[in-house]
């Protein structure tokens, strides 16, 4: 598993980040959508997915 940081914004353009452990980028996004209900309905608000290097 790798460590990912998912950056997203809300409707007022406030920036947020959530960290997830996942096997790949797709899974990291899916975990973020489970943990942040807003993202489940608004996945287009995800701005970036960064793989953290060890």
Q: Predicted segment positions?
A:
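Short aromatic-glycine-(Arg/Gly/Cys) micro-motifs in beta-strand/loop hairpins
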Residues: 1-16
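Generic alpha-helical structural signal
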Residues: 3, 27-28
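Intrinsic low-complexity/disordered segments
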Residues: 9-11, 27, 39-41
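Generic detector of bulky aromatic hydrophobic side chains
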Residues: 12-17, 45, 49
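A short, exposed loop/beta-hairpin motif centered on an aromatic-Gly-Thr core
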Residues: 13-27
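Short, mixed-charge low-complexity intrinsically disordered segments
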Residues: 30, 34-54
């Amino acid at each position: 598993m790798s460590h990912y940081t998912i950056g997203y914004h809300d409707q007022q353009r406030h920036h947020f980040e959530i960290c997830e452990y996942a096997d790949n980028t797709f899974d990291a996004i899916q975990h973020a959508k489970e943990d942040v209900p807003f993202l489940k309905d608004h996945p287009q608000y995800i701005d970036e997915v960064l793989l953290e290097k060890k």
